[in-house]
Structures are given as structure tokens and as C-alpha cells.
């Protein structure tokens, strides 16, 4: 647990890795994943195709990071612990759900490996799950890991960091107290209050038709084409006139949602029935998986394995790599030694007394 070791390429142990969006963002900034895990077979195949044979297909509840000697020590533990139980789209069993409780396995990996830092990702719904008790418990669990971690959660909108998609996610960044590295979340780089404008869906999709991988078009019914002809750029099902025979009462607003070319896309989702794919404009059709991958900021040489539906799931579940690169850059001095250590204990004690709301506001106020 040396605090002075200088690392050229900080090493990552990645769990709940999916196809590797979070890892890719860190790799693009000079980090290297040396061990990874997921239980979804095709996501593991995609990860392996892009990062090499460092990922292990196994149920994380069957892995003991304290005794499994095949899991190496690392500089960073990262992962997006399963989010379905915390999503604002569905009901929120949160900590009472079998998936929500999996975050504790993430905490066990941090406890076993004692990395200098960890990054955990989850959906915005985590902020309100179990009436706010879920995130409070998660923070306390992370803070209690010896020798102590300063935990700073922040709600990111990845469109503000160069992703051509409005996508809100909570990132927890924890830094080991004995490093003396006071991590501060990076301020937005894109948008009306930043130095650069949003990267738009139209800009992101330029030339996408030339990409040979994961770019199959999906056949749709003539009725769907007729519905799309009634929906304007950036619109959705609610734009269909209520007196039109194609209108169905009770549809939720993100059904048959078409992109707006001069702004980032709405959130790309992983699954769902008819009308949830996300739809092109001006062409009356669903987005291809490669178009969805572009909107998630994946490069064209990132190849996804599996069926069209399976690839859709991987892309929709992924963390957009471009969205976390600023976090990876901000953490890098911790591993190069290019910082002046400070005593983190006063900050740690101060934040422990804060409510979750106060902590989030405090973390946002210090962004630079």
C-alpha cells in the first residue's frame, strides 16, 4: 500500500465490466485493465475482442477477492454495479433487490485490493432509491473500508463531457486517505455554460453508413413507418395527433423517439419492446447498433459480439467512454506522483457529517 509508487500505466481490476465502456474511457487515458469480470456471455466476448483475454466469465457472487490469488493487485477498481434496481424508469427495490445488493461485492473487491482509487457508476435513480437510504448506505460502506476512503459522488450528464447523448449517471470516486490526493470532479467541457458546444447527434452520425460492423438495419412494419412519418425531428409518440387511428392512449413518452440532429440524442436504453429502439431522422427507421454506439461515443473499431438484440443490450448498458475520460485524466496525477499530498482526514471527517444532499452540493461547488 505504498503511497509514493509512480506508475506509468495505472492498472485496473474491472468488475461488472459489461462490454467495456468504462474501461475504454480509462484505457484512452493511459490506464490498463489487467483483470475483469462479468457474467453475461456475449458482453464478455465483446470485452475480450477489444481488450484481450483478461476477462473472466463468472458469477461475481461465486468469487472471493480475499482468497482468489488469480486476482492481481491493482491501482484502481472500477465498475458499474448493476443498476436495474435503482433505475427511475422502473420500480425501485434498491437495497432490497437481488441486483441492488450486488454493490457490496464491489465494496469487497475494494476492501481486498486496497487500490489507491475506485470508481463506481450507477443510474440517477440511485439518488432517490429507498427514500435516499440506498445511496447513504453505499457511501457509508465505501467510507468504512480500511484504511479509509474519501468518497465523492457526483451526478454527471455525459453530454457535458463530449458525448453526443444526454445521459445522466452517478459516479462515485473514492481515494484512499493515506495517498493525500484530494480528487476534485472535473467541470463540464461542453454545453451552453462551457467552452465548447454540445457534440450533436447529427455530427456523431456523419459517415456512419460506411462502417461495416454492427450496422445492420432492422426490418419494421409498414404501420411503424406510417407512425414515424407523423413524428417530427426530436419528437416521440405523443406528437401523433390524438384523433389519428395510429394514436394509442397511455403510451409513455420515450416510445418512438426520433433523434434531433442539432443536439445530443436522448438516453440510449438497453432493452424494451416495440418503439424503444430510438429512431433515425430523417429516415423512417430504427437506429442501427453502430449508430447507437456512435451516440454512446464508442469508436468504429470497437466490435460488439452477439445478435442484434444482444448487441443493443450491451451498448445501452455501457458507460460512454468519452464521458469518463475527464475523470481518468483528473485521477492520473495520483499515479504519476505529480501532486502535493495534503491531509485528507479533516475533509473526510467533515463530509461524514453531511447528508447526501449536502455532500452532492459540496462536491459540485468545488469542481474546477
Residue map of PLM features:
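A short, Lys/Arg-enriched amphipathic alpha-helix followed by its capping loop at the start of a domain
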Residues: 25-32, 50
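Conserved SAM/SAH-binding beta-strand->alpha-helix loop
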Residues: 40-41
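S-adenosyl-L-methionine
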Residues: 45-68
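The conserved SAM/SAH-binding core of class I Rossmann-like methyltransferase domains
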Residues: 36-37
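Conserved proline-anchored active-site loop of SAM-dependent methyltransferases
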Residues: 12-21, 26, 60, 71-90, ...
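Class I S-adenosyl-L-methionine
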Residues: 66-74, 84-255
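C-terminal target-recognition/interaction regions appended to catalytic cores
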Residues: 215-368
Amino acid at each position: 500500500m505504498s503511497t509514493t509508487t509512480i506508475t506509468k500505466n495505472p492498472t485496473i481490476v474491472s468488475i461488472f465490466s459489461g462490454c467495456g465502456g468504462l474501461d475504454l474511457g480509462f484505457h484512452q487515458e493511459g490506464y490498463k485493465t489487467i483483470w475483469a469480470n462479468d457474467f453475461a456471455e456475449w458482453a464478455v466476448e465483446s470485452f475480450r475482442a477489444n481488450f484481450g483475454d483478461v476477462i473472466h466469465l463468472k458469477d461475481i457472487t461465486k468469487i472471493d477477492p480475499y482468497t482468489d490469488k488469480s486476482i492481481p493487485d491493482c491501482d484502481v477498481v472500477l465498475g458499474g454495479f448493476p443498476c436495474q434496481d435503482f433505475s427511475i424508469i422502473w420500480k425501485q427495490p434498491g437495497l432490497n433487490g437481488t441486483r441492488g445488493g450486488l454493490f457490496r461485492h464491489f465494496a469487497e473487491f475494494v476492501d481486498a485490493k486496497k487500490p489507491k482509487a475506485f470508481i463506481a457508476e450507477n443510474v440517477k435513480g440511485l439518488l432517490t432509491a429507498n427514500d435516499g437510504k440506498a445511496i447513504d448506505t453505499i457511501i457509508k460502506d465505501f467510507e468504512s473500508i480500511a484504511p479509509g476512503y474519501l468518497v465523492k459522488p457526483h451526478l454527471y450528464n455525459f453530454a457535458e463531457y463530449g458525448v453526443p447523448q444526454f445521459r445522466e449517471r452517478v459516479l462515485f470516486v473514492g481515494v484512499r486517505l493515506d495517498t493525500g490526493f484530494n480528487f476534485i470532479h472535473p467541470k463540464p467541457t461542453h454545453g451552453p455554460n462551457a467552452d465548447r458546444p454540445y457534440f450533436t447527434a447529427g455530427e456523431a452520425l456523419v459517415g456512419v453508413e460506411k462502417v461495416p460492423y454492427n450496422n445492420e438495419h432492422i426490418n419494421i412494419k409498414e404501420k411503424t413507418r406510417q407512425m414515424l412519418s407523423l413524428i417530427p425531428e426530436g419528437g416521440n409518440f405523443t406528437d401523433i395527433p390524438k384523433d389519428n387511428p395510429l394514436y394509442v392512449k397511455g403510451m409513455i413518452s420515450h416510445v418512438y423517439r426520433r433523434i434531433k440532429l442539432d443536439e445530443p440524442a436522448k438516453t440510449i436504453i438497453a432493452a424494451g419492446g416495440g418503439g424503444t429502439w430510438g429512431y433515425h431522422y430523417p429516415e423512417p427507421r430504427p437506429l442501427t447498433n453502430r449508430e447507437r454506439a456512435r451516440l454512446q461515443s464508442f469508436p468504429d473499431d470497437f466490435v460488439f459480439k452477439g445478435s442484434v438484440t444482444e448487441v443493443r443490450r450491451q451498448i445501452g448498458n455501457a458507460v460512454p467512454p468519452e464521458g469518463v475520460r475527464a475523470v481518468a485524466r483528473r485521477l492520473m496525477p495520483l499515479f504519476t506522483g505529480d501532486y502535493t499530498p495534503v491531509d485528507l482526514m479533516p475533509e473526510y471527517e467533515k463530509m461524514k457529517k453531511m447528508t447526501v444532499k449536502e455532500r452532492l452540493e459540496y462536491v459540485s461547488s468545488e469542481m474546477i
